[in-house]
């Protein structure tokens, strides 16, 4: 007897496949489109989690109310600083599996999470803005200026944050304490 896919699971799988293939028509893309040029001409910092990241640097950003992106386990710094990123980005399956509760508790403007993590790994982040990813072409990462279609995947989530920042109209993006 052949293994049969449960009818509900089959429908879910086909729906997910359709959304990934036609992301621009999805409710997720519609939510992302609302962000287009919302911070036109403003500056932001893309904060890496490198070992040289200091709380003093973050406090300066906090005191000057500078827009910023943080990612992955940046919340581990929160007990040492008043700074919080305005935007959070993650596409790391293992980190999200391990830290889903922490990410759900983040009280920030927006959390950007790869839709793959929701669909394939059942990682459901409260109030997340889900994005689709496309891999590189012949090893060269694709930079997308239309995140409602896809974000070009790279070895670093900072690359994803930069694409989101550009889409939102943030013209001066400063990467800070990022490692590749």
Segments from the language model and where they lie:
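Membrane-proximal basic amphipathic "stem/tether" segments
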Residues: 1-33
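Short amphipathic alpha-helical segments, especially helix-boundary/capping motifs
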Residues: 8-9, 49-52, 135-140
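Short, mixed-charge, low-aromatic patches
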Residues: 12-14, 55-57, 117-122
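Short acidic/polar alpha-helix capping motifs at helix-coil junctions
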Residues: 17-25, 38-42, 126-129
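Acidic/Gly/His-enriched mid-domain segments of enzyme catalytic cores or analogous surface patches
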Residues: 22, 64-67, 73-166
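Intrinsically disordered, low-complexity segments enriched in small residues
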Residues: 25-68, 77-80, 84, 89-90, ...
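Glycine-rich anion-binding loop/nest that anchors nucleotide
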Residues: 45-51, 153-166, 171-180
